[in-house]
Regions:
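Structured soluble/peripheral alpha/beta segments that form catalytic or ligand/cofactor-binding pockets
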Residues: 1-329
Length: 329
């Protein structure tokens, strides 16, 4: 049974254990890593995904992982700088209105700034992917809507935990330039989500997440279907959003491709409550994917239906933009 939490809770008790477990529509889980009592390290992962019908930009700032996919012409360019950030020194909280993260080396200059209204992202990357120079200058504006917030302790030792926020409530304006190709981002047609994760775990996990952030029949649609981390009986990451309203889903059955990234993935739950197929884009017979350190992002489309008893009719996914993130952490 999924447990919805509506009031604010500290993530850690006085003894460092995580006793609350569940999910929420707002960021009610108050996190302070200094209250943790685990012997292992705390990991921090922030990811942005910006997309319209022409281009998608993936940006992860745990290590610097950047991928730009051309959705009309086909093809993806990507690069990675293995440089872990300490977010306690460069805090970008989901609800904050200040804070800045800066990184500079011989090839890359990256700036991420919190603003009262959202985020400002700027990047100059020389010889991006060993092919072309990359430049982007993007303003993310926060819009109204709910977010998915999940806290999952680990059963055998509740001092270990997994805390997630999936925030699909930004629109983007600005430009992305890769070599001589320039993509314009307009707030009316370009969506962005923010994926925020904090955790301390006793072992490594192979993690997968299917996400979408597009328009269906003029309404914004966002999706998050993810594999299990920790004890998520009371709260998992599985959900979708229509025009900012969160619809929670329970366990999802996934039939993957056995490592063949160009093959379809199948996602099912309940009595056809979830029945969707993810089909990767292919270029010259290969999946359109970015390979960055221990993370792979596959770009593709969704087909199928989502059904709920409180919906007048099924939500039909037909050639809807989507992507799968595969990573080890």
């Amino acid at each position: 049974m999924q447990h919805e939490i509506t009031e604010k809770h500290n993530v850690f008790e006085e003894n460092g254990e995580v006793m609350c477990a569940g999910w929420a529509r707002t960021p009610v889980f108050e996190y302070n890593s200094e209250q943790s009592k685990t012997s292992g390290k705390h990991s921090e992962r922030d990811c942005y995904f910006i997309s319209n019908t022409e281009v998608s930009l993936y940006l992860s700032v745990e290590n610097l992982k950047i991928a730009v996919a051309d959705l009309k012409r086909g093809g993806v360019i990507y690069d990675c700088v293995v440089k872990k950030f300490v977010f306690s020194k460069n805090e970008l909280p989901e609800s904050g209105s200040s804070g800045e993260l800066l990184y500079t080396d011989k090839r890359l200059q990256l700036q991420l700034t919190n603003t009262p209204n959202g985020r400002f992202l700027k990047c100059d990357f020389i010889d991006f992917g060993g092919i072309k120079n990359l430049y982007f200058n993007i303003n993310l504006k926060k819009t109204a809507g709910e977010s998915l917030n999940e806290i999952a302790p680990f059963e055998r030792d509740r001092k270990y935990f997994y805390l997630k926020r999936f925030v699909p409530k930004f629109v983007a304006g600005g430009i992305i330039r890769v070599g001589g190709m320039e993509y314009s981002l307009n707030e009316t047609t370009t969506n962005a989500y923010f994926d925020w994760t904090r955790f301390s775990k006793p072992r490594k996990h192979n993690y997968q997440r299917l996400s979408s952030d597009c328009f269906i029949d003029g309404k914004r649609f966002s999706l998050c279907l993810a594999s299990r981390v920790g004890d998520n009986r009371y709260g998992n990451e599985n959900c979708f959003f229509t025009d900012g309203h969160l619809v929670k889903l329970s366990q999802i059955n996934v039939k993957s491709t056995g490592g063949k990234l160009d093959r379809p993935w199948y996602f099912k739950a309940g009595y056809s409550a979830v029945d969707i197929i993810f089909k990767p884009f292919t270029v010259k017979g290969e999946a359109m994917a970015a390979y960055m350190d221990k993370t792979t992002v596959i770009f593709g489309r969704l087909y199928g239906e989502l059904k709920r008893v409180d919906m007048d009719k099924p939500l039909v996914l037909d050639n809807s933009q989507a992507h799968i993130v595969l990573t080890e952490f």
